[in-house]
Amino acid sequence: MKNKMKAAAASIIFCIIFVFCFVKCVELLENKSARVQYEAFFESETNFDVIFLGTSHMYNTVLPQELWNEFGITSYNWGYSNCTTAENYYILQEVLKYTEPKLIVLDMYGLLAYENYGNGKYRTDRIEQQHVQFDSIPFSLNTYRASKDVFDDYSGNLDFMFNFIMYHNRWTELGEGDFTVTPSTQKGASFNVGLQQDAEFERLETDEKMEIDTVCYQYFLQILEYCSENEIQLLCVYLPYTASAKEQMVSNSIGEIIEAYDFCDYINLLYSDILNLKTDIYDSGHVNYLGASKVTSWLGDYVLENYNLSGHADEETYSGQWNTEYEEYVQYKMRTISAEKELYNKLLLIYGDEFEADLKILDGCNAEKEDEILSELIAELSDSISVEYVEELSLEDKKYDILLTIKRGNEIFDVVGYEYQNTQTIEYSY
């Protein structure tokens, strides 16, 4: 009898150790992007008043930490690269299990973009991107339905329920980031650093529309019905970027559709005057940090004015956690600024009320006059930058044409010199 009890106990202990080791192996081998992006959502001690959903347009444009700093709004950005409306239909239902937002904001880009990929519900050539969001969500009946529906033509759709199937052979890919995971400080968002020169936007008339009949459009209608039936406030938004003619026609066609649904509204920001095409564009589909900050500020004003929201900056239950995490975000921005080499990128990153810059230009240097982008950036930063012309400039015994000093309060954390060259193109060397 004792031997049987010992054998049973040994079996139980073995099973416990095996399960523990298996779980740890699963955690080690999984792609850590999901934890980096969404761990802060699941571990938050406070509610989120606003949830943002959508594609990379939302992911790169709306910055929750800036919303907190300016308005005291608590929000999380669940947008991600190539996240389709079909995926958002299921992600929305999962997110609502963990927080009780007063408003859902849905990015409208993508109603046409994915129609020529497989079943039209996801990017067949971006499976790894689709995993980032679904890997973060605990298994449920809803995720099972999503894997069988959205990825119905993908032979490995079980990966989206049990991601160990996909990642079990990552042993050779493991790096330092797999052993120490640092969650993003951006509350799901990710701002772009860079500037597209000569960006153009050929605006259509708002009455130029088109019929939308795509797979993702059908899921968009399901989202409208879901929010309307459950009395969830939904704001659909077409975020600003240099859209094509067809994309503009889609943006012009959405409003009439949404009017038929209670609790659902629509704003089209493609034709707003929020962006400066000379300073705010990252590429043909996205804005940079400067553009994102402007759009975020505009949306903050809009939702406070039009929805039942108020700031939490003076509430202890919110301010402790959010102020601490905002400071971590600012420190991340400071590291990003210091690591950046390009003059334009440093300047666009100091937009806002956190940083100040002193820009010294050597007498006789015509950079401000000859470089339209530089002069536009200086104008955009008028509240936080001072420009001074001096007779001599040097840094560490090297002479420069331009010297940029960036500080936060009284702390100078970045100083860099540039030589200005204007031949056929304008260039800055450092």
Segments and roles (model prediction):
Residues 6-26:
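Hydrophobic membrane-insertion alpha-helices, especially the h-region
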Residues 190-257, 261, 266-274:
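Flexible, glycine-rich surface segments
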Residues 249-326, 330:
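C-terminal regions of proteins
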